Amino acid sequence: MVKRGKKTKYLFVTGGVVSSLGKGLAAASIGALLENRGLEVTHLKLDPYINVDPGTMSPFQHGEVYVTDDGAETDLDLGHYERFTSAKMTRKNNYTTGRIYSNVIQRERRGEYLGKTVQVIPHITDEIKAVIREAAGGVDILIVEVGGTVGDIESLPFLEAIRQMKYDVGEENAVYAHLTLVPFIAAAGELKTKPTQHSVKELREIGIQPDLLLCRSDREIAREMKDKIALFCNVDPSAVFTALDVKSIYEVPLSLHKEGLDDKLAELFNIWSRAPRLDKWEQIVQKVKAPKHGEVRVGVVGKYVELHESYKSLNEALVHGGIGADVRVKQVFIDSTKLEEGDLSELNQVDAILVPGGFGVRGTEGKILAVRHAREHKIPFFGICLGLQMAVIEFGRSVLGLERANSLEFDEQTPHPVVTLMEAQKAVADKGGTMRLGTYPCALKDGTKARELYGVDLVQERHRHRYEFNNAYRAQYEGAGMVFSGTNPELNLVEMIELNNHPHFVGCQFHPEFKSKPFAPHPLFAGFVHAAREQRDQQADRRAAVTKLPVGKNV
C-alpha cells in the first residue's frame, strides 16, 4: 500500500570502469546511514540481463539467488539491503530486463497500446519508471541500484529511464551517485584518475550528470586529487568521496559517514534529518575485528566453493553467528567432489561442518561422506535444505541399513526414496519460479534443540526447494533415534531434524541465512557457531591433558 503525505526522493546508484565494485554494498550502506538519520528507506535493484529472474541461472555465473518472504528469486544485493536496513524486500524490489520486456509485451498482446508501435522509448522506459515509482511505496528515500557498468549496451534503457526521472520528479527529488575505481598503479607509485574521468564522460554522454562520486580505492584519496576529479568530472569538490577498501563490509557505513556522504545527501535532497546514531555499527565492527574468544574453523562442504558469492548470505550468517558468540568464524570451503576421491583429511581440520543447499547429483556423495564424518566423530553439524536431505540419506544408509537409499532427484530407481518430490511439484513442467518458494510456518517440538534455540513454538522461514523427506519412512527414522523437531503444521512436511546422541546435529529444509542480520544473528547460526566454539575448546582441553601425562604412562 502506498503511503500518503510523503513525496519520495530518489537516489540512483550507477557504476563505472569495472564490474563488482560494490554498488550493492554502497547502496545498502547509504540506506543504513539514512535510516540512522531517522529517514524511511527502501531499495530497488534493476538488473540488465534478459532472464526474468536469476532463479534458473548457474551460481557460477550469477552467485547466490536470494529469496524474499513473498517467494521472489532475486539478486544477492537484496540480501545486503535487508541485512543493513530494516526494509523488507519483495518481488517489487528487483526487476530485470526480461521482466520489464515481458510486462510490456503482455500489455501489447492485450491491446493496451491502442495500435501504437511499441518501442524502447517511450514504452520500455515508461515501464521502468513505473516500477521505480511502485517500489517507492511512499518512503522518504528510494535507493535505486542500476546493475552492470556504464557503457554496457544492456543498461541503456535503464539509464535513459533514470535520466528522465530527474525531470519528472524535480531537481531536489533525484540524486545521481556514481561509483568508480581509482586504481593505484604500483609501477608509477600513484593513484590514477583517468578511468574515473572516462567513466563519468560516458555517463554524461548518455545525459546524466552525476551529483556525487564514490571513488573506490585501496587507500585514502588526497584532497588535491579529489579536486582534480571534481574539475574534470564537473562535480562539486565536496561531492567527491573515497570509498575505501575495508576489512569488514560492516565498516562501510562508518567509512562513508566519516567521509561526510550522508551529510552531503541531506544537503542535496534538501531534507531535514537528525545526526546518525552509529554506536551499534561501531560495536559490531569491534566484535568482527577483535572478538574476545578467538577463532573457530567451520568447514562449508559444497560444490560451488570456487565462487564464494554462491553462498553470500550463508557466509554473512556465519559472521553474524560469530558476532553472537564473540568469536571470529574462519570459513574453510571444502569441495564435496574432491571428498568423493576418499581424502577426508580436510574435515579433521575444522571445528564444525556445514552442508549448504544446492541442486543436482554432482558432489552429493561427498556431502554424504561429510555428514557421516560429522555424525560418527561428534563434530557439530548443520545441514541446510539439501544439507538436511544429505543427512537423511546418510542416516538411512548407515544407521537403518537402507541400501542405496537416496533422493528421487538423484536416482529415480532407488529402492528407498527417503527424499521424494513434493506432491505439489509433480505436475510442474516449467523450471523458473515454480519451486516451493517464500515464507512458510514451522512448528517446533518441545524439548528439542530447535525449540531451545528459537525460544518459541512457531517460526516463519524462507524456502526454496522441490523435494522433501518421505514421511513413509518417518517411523523407522524415529525408532532409530532421529528427531523430527520441526514440521509444517498445514502439510506435515518435515522442516527440521536433529540427533539427541550428538553435541549438535541439526538440519533444516528452509534457508535461515536469508533472515539473519548482524544485529540479530539467526538462532540456528548462533547455536551452531556456539557449538563450534565448544568443540574447539574441548579439543584444546583434551590436547592439553595429553601433554600433561607423566612420562612413560600407558594410556
Curated annotation (Swiss-Prot):
What Pfam families does UniProt report for this protein, alphabetically?
Answer: CTP_synth_N (PF06418), GATase (PF00117)
* UniProt-annotated catalytic positions: 385, 511, 513
Task: Summarize what activates or inhibits it.
Answer: Allosterically activated by GTP, when glutamine is the substrate; GTP has no effect on the reaction when ammonia is the substrate. The allosteric effector GTP functions by stabilizing the protein conformation that binds the tetrahedral intermediate(s) formed during glutamine hydrolysis. Inhibited by the product CTP, via allosteric rather than competitive inhibition.
Instruction: State its role.
Output: Catalyzes the ATP-dependent amination of UTP to CTP with either L-glutamine or ammonia as the source of nitrogen. Regulates intracellular CTP levels through interactions with the four ribonucleotide triphosphates.
Q: Which family does it belong to?
A: Belongs to the CTP synthase family.
All copies of the Glutamine amidotransferase type-1 domain together span 297-538
* Catalysed reactions listed for this entry: UTP + L-glutamine + ATP + H2O = CTP + L-glutamate + ADP + phosphate + 2 H(+); L-glutamine + H2O = L-glutamate + NH4(+); UTP + NH4(+) + ATP = CTP + ADP + phosphate + 2 H(+)
Q: Which residues form the signal peptide?
A: none
More about this protein:
CTPSs have evolved a hybrid strategy for distinguishing between UTP and CTP. The overlapping regions of the product feedback inhibitory and substrate sites recognize a common feature in both compounds, the triphosphate moiety. To differentiate isosteric substrate and product pyrimidine rings, an additional pocket far from the expected kinase/ligase catalytic site, specifically recognizes the cytosine and ribose portions of the product inhibitor.
Q: Which UniProt keywords apply?
A: ATP-binding, Glutamine amidotransferase, Ligase, Magnesium, Metal-binding, Nucleotide-binding, Pyrimidine biosynthesis
- Where, by residue number, does ATP bind? 20-25, 77
Residues the record lists as binding Mg(2+): 77, 145
Q: List the source organism.
A: Anaeromyxobacter sp. (strain Fw109-5)
Q: Which GO terms describe its cellular component?
A: cytosol
Residues binding CTP, per UniProt: 19, 152-154, 192-197, 228
- EC numbers for this chain: 6.3.4.2
Q: State any GO BP term from the record.
A: pyrimidine nucleobase biosynthetic process
Subunit: Homotetramer.
Q: Which InterPro entries match?
A: Class_I_gatase-like, CTP_synthase, CTP_synthase_N, GATASE, GATase1_CTP_Synthase, P-loop_NTPase
> Which GO MF term does the entry hold, naming one?
ATP binding
Pathway assigned to this chain's UniProt record: Pyrimidine metabolism; CTP biosynthesis via de novo pathway; CTP from UDP: step 2/2
- Which of this chain's residues are annotated to bind UTP? 19, 192-197, 228
The UniProt annotation places L-glutamine binding at 358, 386-389, 409, 466
Instruction: State the protein's name.
Output: CTP synthase
